[in-house]
């Protein structure tokens, strides 16, 4: 059994947070990895901005304001540059990043990385290409996220859902573009179709607060399009999200160069929801083009693929079954094993 310490100084959350409401991707990843490592027999402590000390599913959640230990077998610093130098006598230090690594060029990151030389862990092949080759480090590892077990065991649907598309990502990542396309091309071709949006700043904590006005403008526009089948609602906790995805026929998401994993599409695909996107950022890693969804090269082909999946039952079923077969294999236990290999 190894002693594993994880530190995060972002938003306030703990192991019970996914059960209480929607949670950002990086935060959900910390919870899932910590629990998977405990499941593999390790002692895991998470030091973060949780409201109070808590043990949940075997993971010790401890307010970081009280300090961190000096030693561990594996220390995982999550995102923040101030965390890199903590737990100084850890046998192996890891810097786990989730956003494109361009920001690591900032002097405060370069200095902290130069002093500690941790292994930088990226969450996908595209993500790894954003790490500058000259960046000080003790190694570079690619460890994709796993999928929560709730997403990995869906059965094939007996009949297709109604012509309902769903969007569950950051509204600043292409939702305006999608609303344009919905109004100009998709809805006119299929007036009975609906676009259900579950998005908002609450998922992103303080970062969402800083972007709340910009998000609100896009979401207000979505609400104004109710007459053409657009339904705008709040982000959903996990159980309700799974239900909404299973009742949707296709996930529509343009993609973004800042998308390093895209849990929204990964979860939809694992549940058998075909997806239409463009080949931006990590989206080619999430969709098997022409098999579990479509990677559209332009707006016209995006609209055509969307309409086809909303309308054509045979096309939908083929991609639905392929997604169930091919897109739900990687678990958080798999990801935990990859982190285990970093322990000296």
Identify the meaning behind each predicted range.
Residues 314-343:
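A charged, aromatic-enriched C-terminal amphipathic alpha-helix characteristic of glycosyltransferases
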Residues 149, 157-224, 231-232:
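Conserved catalytic-core segment of nucleotide-activated headgroup transferases in glycan assembly
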Residues 176, 242, 265-270, 284-285, ...:
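Short alpha-helical segment that forms part of, or immediately flanks, the ligand-binding pocket
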Residues 289-300, 308-313:
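Conserved acidic donor-binding segment of nucleotide-sugar-dependent glycosyltransferases
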């Amino acid at each position: 059994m190894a002693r594993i310490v994880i530190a995060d100084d972002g938003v306030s959350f703990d192991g019970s947070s996914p059960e209480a409401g929607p949670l950002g991707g990086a935060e959900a990843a910390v919870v899932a990895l910590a629990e998977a490592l405990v499941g593999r027999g390790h002692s895991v402590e998470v030091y973060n901005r949780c409201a109070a000390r808590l043990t949940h599913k075997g993971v010790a959640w401890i307010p970081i304001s009280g300090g961190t230990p000096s030693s561990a077998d594996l220390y995982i610093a999550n995102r923040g540059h101030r965390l890199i130098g903590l737990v100084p006598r850890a046998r192996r230090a890891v810097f786990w990043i989730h956003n494109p690594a361009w920001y690591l060029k900032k002097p405060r990151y370069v200095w902290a990385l130069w002093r500690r030389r941790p292994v930088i862990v990226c969450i996908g092949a595209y993500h790894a290409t954003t790490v500058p080759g000259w960046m000080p480090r003790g190694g570079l590892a690619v460890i994709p996220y796993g999928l929560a077990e709730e997403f990995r065991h869906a059965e094939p649907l007996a009949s297709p859902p109604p012509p309902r598309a769903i969007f569950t990502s950051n509204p600043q990542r292409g939702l305006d573009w999608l609303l344009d396309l919905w109004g100009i091309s998709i809805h006119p071709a299929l007036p009975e179709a609906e676009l259900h949006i579950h998005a908002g700043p609450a998922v992103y904590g303080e970062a969402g607060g800083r972007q709340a006005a910009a998000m609100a403008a896009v979401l207000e526009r979505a609400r104004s399009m109710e007459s053409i089948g657009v339904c705008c609602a709040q982000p959903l906790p996990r159980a309700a999200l799974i239900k909404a995805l299973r009742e949707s026929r296709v996930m529509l998401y343009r993609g973004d160069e800042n998308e390093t994993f895209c849990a929204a599409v990964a979860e939809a695909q694992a549940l058998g929801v075909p997806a239409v996107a463009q080949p931006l950022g990590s989206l080619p890693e999430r969709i098997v083009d022409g098999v579990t969804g479509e990677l559209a090269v332009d707006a016209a082909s995006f609209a055509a693929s969307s309409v086809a999946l909303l309308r054509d039952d045979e096309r939908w079923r083929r991609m639905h079954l392929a997604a169930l077969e091919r897109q739900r294999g990687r678990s958080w236990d798999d990801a935990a094993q990859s982190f285990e290999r970093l322990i000296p």
